[in-house]
UniProtKB/Swiss-Prot annotation:
It comes from Thermosipho melanesiensis (strain DSM 12029 / CIP 104789 / BI429). Its EC number is 2.4.1.14. SUPFAM superfamilies: UDP-Glycosyltransferase/glycogen phosphorylase. This is Probable sucrose-phosphate synthase. It comes from the Bacteria. Pfam families: Glycos_transf_1 (PF00534), GT-B_Sucrose_synth (PF00862). One of its GO terms (molecular function) is sucrose-phosphate synthase activity. Keywords: Glycosyltransferase, Transferase. Belongs to the glycosyltransferase 1 family.
């Protein structure tokens, strides 16, 4: 089967350039890449359709095609639209018609895909436009929905000017309506986000085609091994989120500073040297410095996995305390290395940790302290149970199989003997 992934924002290349360094290069890109690779390993031909960028600040994304060395069936296809320069996702809405028309022209030359998976509202509306042109069915995976983000802003006018919520939400509703099926990562996302008042006019007709398919973890990178390359003076608390207000790293710094400095050390992972950051990010770094936090510059997932394994050897903890976390891919990456987790009560982590069975959910500094001490006293048991949880429920192979089962219901799958006759 030939499957196209529509992901206009951010970009992809074999080096994972800029991954986690920019809001448009976050967990969604990891999701798309890993799901595409898992489908490719099952014999499907997969195209990730993104944007061609000719910009000195983003030199990695100027080629028409790119490939992953470990995924022979996966191709990155960059389509020109919206000019040459890099554009944040909020500015792409004006050019999605051009994106779709150029995808159509591209596939006219080499044959169209059997199915399209679309990602975020921009990919979703592109899938709907593409379906109108070709009648090729698509699925919609929002990753996050505009209504929930809109609710967090007090000044509606400023929020609309910056994030263009009216356009985003209208695109999401069309994507939902015409999708063959909709994928969410958690039950909470299915039940609460899609039933929001902004979507109430389409929810009754889409609710039965929403399926919960948890994402996976790359077990070729994140797995327990004997790595112990990092040394710690005390029990490490690891934070590896983007330095973004949404990730609420201040909460971890404050909890550590108030209660845990004697027995633990705080390690914050950065993508570049501390002095190279500015604005809010620099303020956060200075706050961590005052609390005696330490910093490690890590620029690859493989190196991050080494850190997690070393931290687990030293009875460490992984912390992710976002104000809201749609899923929590970083959590399962840590758990796959047997590194126990303290996380936010808001969003996907509640389901990953099964309401606290496989890790600790917190909302106050006191709860963070208690969680850290409980992990310390029950380390081996929680470490093993965390790992088993990931292996049983959160692999990309399982995620891909569930997608493909739904895709096959939308397509005529012929035996190879007859498929060849169709040319």
């Amino acid at each position: 089967m030939k499957i196209a992934f529509f992901n206009p924002q951010g970009n992809f290349d074999k080096k994972d350039s800029h991954l986690t360094e920019h809001p448009d290069f976050g967990g969604q890109l990891i999701y798309v890449k890993e799901l595409a690779k898992a489908m490719g390993k099952m014999g499907n031909k997969v195209d990730i359709i993104t944007r061609k960028i000719i910009d000195k600040k983003w030199p990695e994304f100027s080629g028409d095609f790119d490939y992953y060395p470990d995924a022979e069936n996966v191709r990155i296809v960059r389509i020109a639209f919206g000019g040459d320069k890099f554009l944040n996702k909020e500015r792409l809405w004006d050019f999605l018609g051009e994106y779709v028309k150029n995808i159509y022209r591209f596939y006219q030359k080499e044959g169209f895909p059997d199915f399209v998976t679309t990602h975020y509202g921009d990919g979703g509306i592109a899938g709907a436009m593409f379906k109108k042109l070709t009648h090729i069915p698509y699925s919609f995976t929002a990753h996050s929905l505009g209504a929930q983000k809109k609710d967090k802003f007090k000044n509606a006018k400023d929020a609309e000017e910056r994030y263009r919520f009216s356009i985003r939400i209208s695109a999401e509703k069309v994507a939902m309506k015409y999708a063959s099926f909709i994928v969410t990562s958690t039950q909470q996302e299915k039940e609460e986000q899609y039933s929001h008042n902004e979507y109430i006019d389409v929810y009754p007709e889409i609710k039965d085609k929403i399926f919960v398919i948890p994402p996976g973890v790359n077990t070729n990178i994140f797995y327990p091994d004997d790595t112990d390359e990092y040394k710690f003076s005390k029990l490490p608390i690891i934070v590896s989120s983007r330095l973004d207000p949404k990730k609420n790293i201040e909460f971890v710094i404050e909890s550590f500073n108030k209660y845990l400095k004697d027995g633990f050390e705080l390690i914050i992972v950065l993508r570049k040297k501390p002095e190279e950051y500015t604005g809010y990010e620099r303020q956060l770094i200075e706050k961590a410095k005052k609390a005696k936090g330490k910093f490690l510059v890590i620029t690859s997932q493989k190196e991050l996995a080494k850190l997690y394994n070393s931290a687990a050897k030293h009875r460490g903890i992984f912390a992710l305390t976002s104000h809201y976390e749609p899923f929590g891919l970083a959590i399962i990456e840590a758990m796959a290395c047997k590194l126990p987790v303290i996380s936010t009560r808001n969003g996907g982590p509640v389901e990953i940790l099964d309401n606290g069975k496989y890790g600790h959910l917190v909302s106050t500094h006191e709860e963070f302290k208690e969680a850290a001490l409980k992990i310390k006293d029950n380390y081996e048991k929680l470490s093993e149970e965390s790992y088993k949880r990931v292996m049983e429920k959160y692999t990309w192979e399982r995620c891909a199989k569930e997608y493909l089962n739904l895709i096959e219901k939308e397509n005529v799958i012929l035996p190879e003997f007859f498929e060849k006759q169709m040319g």
